[in-house]
From Swiss-Prot:
Organism of provenance: Serratia proteamaculans (strain 568)
PANTHER family tied to this protein: ACETYL-COENZYME A CARBOXYLASE CARBOXYL TRANSFERASE SUBUNIT ALPHA, ACETYL-COENZYME A CARBOXYLASE CARBOXYL TRANSFERASE SUBUNIT ALPHA, CHLOROPLASTIC
Domain CoA carboxyltransferase C-terminal residues, every copy: 35-296
Gene Ontology terms: biological process: fatty acid biosynthetic process; malonyl-CoA biosynthetic process
HAMAP family found in the cross-reference section: AcetylCoA_CT_alpha
Catalytically driven reaction(s): N(6)-carboxybiotinyl-L-lysyl-[protein] + acetyl-CoA = N(6)-biotinyl-L-lysyl-[protein] + malonyl-CoA
Cellular location(s): Cytoplasm
Role noted for this protein: Component of the acetyl coenzyme A carboxylase (ACC) complex. First, biotin carboxylase catalyzes the carboxylation of biotin on its carrier protein (BCCP) and then the CO(2) group is transferred by the carboxyltransferase to acetyl-CoA to form malonyl-CoA.
Pathway the protein contributes to: Lipid metabolism; malonyl-CoA biosynthesis; malonyl-CoA from acetyl-CoA: step 1/1
Alphabetized InterPro entries for the sequence: Acetyl_CoA_COase_a_su, ClpP/crotonase-like_dom_sf, COA_CT_C
PROSITE patterns, per the entry: COA_CT_CTER (PS50989)
EC number: 2.1.3.15
Name of this protein: Acetyl-coenzyme A carboxylase carboxyl transferase subunit alpha
GO MF entries: acetyl-CoA carboxylase activity; ATP binding; carboxyl- or carbamoyltransferase activity
Amino acid sequence: MSLNFLDFEQPIAELEAKIDSLTAVSRQDEKLDINLDEEVQRLREKSVELTRKIFSDLGAWQVAQLARHPRRPYTLDYIKHIFTDFEELAGDRAYADDKAIVGGIARLDGRPVMIIGHQKGRETKEKIRRNFGMPAPEGYRKALRLMEMASRFKLPLITFIDTPGAYPGVGAEERGQSEAIAHNLREMSRLNIPVVCTVIGEGGSGGALAIGVGDKVNMLQYSTYSVISPEGCASILWKSADKAPLAAEAMGITAPRLKELKLIDSVIPEPLGSAHRDVPAMAATLKAQLLADLKDLDGLNNEELRNRRYQRLMNYGYC
């Protein structure tokens, strides 16, 4: 699988290309008198060192690019690696089944849980089918149906957030996009079950918040959470999307900044080079965080859960 190096990763890409070239030569001609193993190992160590150096000083815009990386693991990838016995549940029982939202019942280390998450696509047809991870009202109403089911059967709710935002099309607005999001915000704050939310990629505005009101809110190290995209902000303030890097820095969209503002609980570290470099390792780290969060919440009664969740929602936008 191609790593799809980003612009700021080009020095790493060049080193990796040299490693691949030397490795290929070594495999194709085993009769070479020159042993390339030492050189390959040296370059690999240099690549790790360079990656560590570059990723130790990333700007907000570079983090935004990583959050959108085409190989970044999505909700279904984490479901595959973290949970067992997943049974997807479809439809909002009113209009349609929105593929931009996936959800269902599964087991986390043997414990039954309800999972809801945004789902983007990788190939062109899947991207269109998933609407690029931008849910319509029926997607949020499907999510609400699963939340209510989880509450009825006392299943902890785990959500994965990864969306540019709610779909802004005319049809979505006609079917009540804002009402669907608002309804979810209200009902999530009232759920009588533990709710753990994790931003795994992009956390775009109300489209993210509609499944993001939790007792614990986490972000992966290279994910983002914001009221608008950097490009959208730049277009409004400077009339040019080219100012997106400047907007990203000003908006405070990164996990460490949001942790500093007490808008999230935990920053979950990613493997060196971001989550797509080592999906199993990323999934293992995320699983450990989910288990720890549920253990913390198990000691709280329903009223305590509701109060802290509601207070978190009310604190958004206030410093």
